[in-house]
UniProtKB/Swiss-Prot annotation:
Signal peptide: none annotated. This is Nucleoprotein. Its main location: virion. InterPro entries: Pneumo_ncap. The modification Phosphotyrosine is found at Y38. The gene is N. Pfam families: Pneumo_ncap.
Length: 391
């Protein structure tokens, strides 16, 4: 489908239709959902840390524990509100710390565990037992374990949630085809943390989050709102800064999805965040202004704040059903455009981007479905070499 066949007014009509709905639906989150409050946040962070210090850790439950930690940062009331606002019928289970006794080698031992419906006390105890084995090994090797290598380091939970931020961007594929990219990116941005913790295995943790988001889609809504809240909070640790960068890259693509002229209002579509618009600068400006009307939380976050940074490579999106707004801006410059732009900043950013693409020689004109007039306009504005124009 050519980009020029998609009309913005179709999108606006659908937006009006969706906005006029008088009814809502209720989804079920299951029998019970654990909603931990701030008071158990430290314990959940420590549980994350136990998994991180455990050599060859079993990360089957890491995604779930990471999400419980995220909820504890939001707080019980806000977590429940997020779920209800998203249309979920919530049966909330409060979470407390309790003492659990277990016989180990003929000796009764006491453990502090959380009253979770989603994670048994036995599993929590097993995580602690395995982490103690690794901790003893660390003591032998180091003599003394520095705070940043311990299981109770305050950034343990956020380290795990950094991988969740990478996974959330890949859910749109409907499978786990993005896993390789997640692993590669995690190995890069979390390289210092990987040196700290032998149990920080990006592949296993990413698979655990894939599992959680696939089985419990309501947690996607929770995570997105957590990410917004976390990223908008000033200060914080180095890892919190890394998380904000990773999450905003995903969120910035646009929570409101314009795809094949259809508007999908759902936080689950942030990772799809692609705009298909008419290949004319006028249309691009209309979409830009439409995004401004909806506001930052409705999507296009980074486009509203930094248009130039949003202009991604056209060659990454050969299918016109997935051209991001910034690409459309660039295409508007390369295509035929007459008149004075209504948004000079956006026009200048798009023009600079298009010219940079030309200078780097990475524009593949064969995927643009350009008319003869548009090709002529490209020659006039960008002066490409003949061999750059592939038909």
């Amino acid at each position: 489908m050519a980009l020029s066949k998609v009309k913005l007014n179709d999108t606006l009509n659908k937006d009006q239709l969706l906005s006029s709905s008088k009814y809502t639906i209720q989804r079920s989150t299951g029998d019970n959902i654990d909603t931990p409050n701030y008071d158990v946040q430290k314990h959940l962070n420590k549980l994350c840390g136990m998994l991180l210090i455990t050599e060859d850790a079993n990360h089957k439950f890491t995604g779930l524990i990471g999400m419980l930690y995220a909820m504890s940062r939001l707080g019980r009331e806000d977590t429940i509100k997020i779920l209800k606002d998203a249309g979920y019928h919530v049966k909330a289970n409060g979470v407390d710390i309790t003492t659990y006794r277990q016989d180990i080698n003929g000796k009764e031992m006491k453990f502090e565990v959380l009253t979770l419906s989603s994670l048994t006390s036995e599993i929590q105890v097993n995580i602690e037992i395995e982490s103690r084995k690794s901790y003893k090994k660390m003591l032998k090797e180091m003599g003394e374990v520095a705070p940043e290598y311990r299981h109770d380091s305050p950034d343990c939970g956020m380290i795990i949630l950094c991988i969740a931020a990478l996974v959330i961007t890949k859910l749109a594929a409907g499978d786990r085809s993005g896993l390789t990219a997640v692993i590669r990116r995690a190995n890069n941005v979390l390289k210092n943390e990987i040196k700290r913790y032998k149990g920080l295995i990006p592949k296993d943790i990413a698979n655990s989050f894939y599992e959680v988001f696939e089985k419990h889609p309501h947690l996607i809504d929770v995570f997105v709102h957590f990410g917004i809240a976390q990223s908008s909070t000033r200060g914080g640790s180095r890892v919190e800064g890394i998380f904000a960068g990773l999450f905003m890259n995903a969120y910035g693509s646009g929570q409101v999805m314009l795809r094949w002229g259809v508007l999908a209002k759902s936080v689950k579509n942030i990772m799809l965040g692609h705009a298909s618009v008419q290949a004319e600068m006028e249309q691009v400006v209309e979409v830009y202004e439409y995004a401004q009307k909806l506001g930052g939380e409705a999507g296009f976050y980074h486009i509203l704040n930094n248009p130039k940074a949003s202009l991604l490579s056209l060659t990454q999106f050969p299918n016109f059903s997935s051209v991001v707004l910034g690409n459309a801006a660039g295409l508007g410059i390369m295509g035929e455009y007459r008149g004075t732009p209504r948004n000079q900043d956006l026009y200048d950013a798009a023009k600079a981007y298009a010219e940079q693409l030309k200078e780097n020689g990475v524009i593949n004109y064969s995927v643009l479905d350009l008319t003869a007039e548009e090709l002529e306009a490209i020659k006039n504005q960008l002066n490409p070499k003949e061999d750059d124009v592939e038909l």
